[in-house]
């Protein structure tokens, strides 16, 4: 696994985008909850930027999902184990949940009503907004409290989710560490067995050389004995032929 892996490049961009989105979400919440009247342009700009940022993050997460599907289809080609894939899937799932929570907060009916109120205040101006706000203080005071409560719940959920991700990553790192230890022990055992086999092969080579030397000596002795046997046969044959020749000559002279 290389640091040039495109997953980590896109992951870094997604993390930056999430940080930006969380900052925009905090500012957007302050604009809606703040006692001071914000301009309509600022509210609209913050809302649009936040929505565009969340949409961009969702697209990047879809791209990361596709890369994981490709890796799962051919894991040997990319040399990624199941633990690394689980870590990547956990990052995508947690980030998608963060985006979903912010979108749910933005689309809540109470938040929409409060946003509409702020927009009306911005259009009517400070003086008219004060007169208009005096008649509906109770109604929007309740909406303010609901938004504050929802925002606090959102922050608590995000903190709990981040803690869960950290714990999952710690567990996965422990699994990876254990796997590395097992592989190290296996490599040491294999190395020891290879050394033993090398010693055995060396001993066998020496024995083979000794056997070959003894075999050469035996072959030389056999050749020498064979040569001596051949010479004796030749002398015997000559003696027999000489005797036969003498007999023939004797018979010839007698006759």
Curated annotation (Swiss-Prot):
The keyword DNA repair does not apply. One of its GO terms (molecular function) is SNAP receptor activity. Residues 2-112 are annotated as: Interaction with BLTP3B. Residues 41-74 form a coiled coil. Residues 2-168 are annotated as: Required for interaction with VPS51. Residues 2-234 are cytoplasmic. Widely expressed, with relatively higher expression in brain, lung and kidney. Keywords: Acetylation, Coiled coil, Endosome, Golgi apparatus, Membrane, Phosphoprotein, Protein transport, Transmembrane, Transmembrane helix, Transport. It is found in: Golgi apparatus membrane; Golgi apparatus, trans-Golgi network membrane; Recycling endosome membrane. Pfam families: SNARE, STX6_10_61_N. The modification Phosphoserine is found at residues 2, 129, 152. GO terms for biological process: endocytic recycling; endosome organization; Golgi vesicle transport; intracellular protein transport; regulation of protein localization; retrograde transport, endosome to Golgi; synaptic vesicle to endosome fusion; vesicle docking. CDD domains: SNARE_NTD_STX6 (cd21447), SNARE_Syntaxin6 (cd15851). It is a single-pass type IV membrane protein. Its main location: Golgi. It comes from the Eukaryota. The modification N-acetylserine is found at residue 2. Residues 163-225 form the t-SNARE coiled-coil homology domain. The chain crosses the membrane at residues 235-255. PANTHER family: GOLGI SNARE BET1-RELATED. SNARE promoting movement of transport vesicles to target membranes. Targets endosomes to the trans-Golgi network, and may therefore function in retrograde trafficking. Together with SNARE STX12, promotes movement of vesicles from endosomes to the cell membrane, and may therefore function in the endocytic recycling pathway. Belongs to the syntaxin family. This is Syntaxin-6. It comes from Rattus norvegicus (Rat).
